[in-house]
């Protein structure tokens, strides 16, 4: 009986996902876990002077305005 109760407690903690944090893609590659106040992922497209495209990605607390910017709020959504 104690084993069953312990199993239920552990499963409840796992399923509640306490302390959820957002995960975003970052530059130059890979992923990052955002800080608690960073609630969005962003992707910024920058054109260099040689007409090359540079993609900047990461976590942000607010979405910057303007063209060539995209923000989202789910895990790994800034691909």
Curated annotation (Swiss-Prot):
Tissue-level expression: Expressed by the venom gland.
Q: Where in the cell is it found?
A: Secreted
Alphabetically sorted, this entry's keywords are: Disulfide bond, Secreted, Signal, Toxin
What is the protein named? Short neurotoxin 3
Give the intrachain disulfide bonds.
24-41, 34-59, 63-71, 72-77
The UniProt entry, under CDD domains, shows: TFP_snake_toxin (cd00206)
Organism name: Oxyuranus scutellatus scutellatus
Q: Note one Pfam family from the annotation.
A: Toxin_cobra-type
Q: Which GO terms describe its cellular component?
A: extracellular region
GO MF annotations for this entry?
toxin activity
Family (UniProt): Belongs to the three-finger toxin family. Short-chain subfamily.
Q: Where is the signal peptide?
A: 1-23
User: Which SUPFAM superfamilies does the UniProt entry name for this protein?
Assistant: Snake toxin-like (SSF57302)
| Gene3D superfamilies, A to Z | CD59
Report the superkingdom from the record.
Answer: Eukaryota
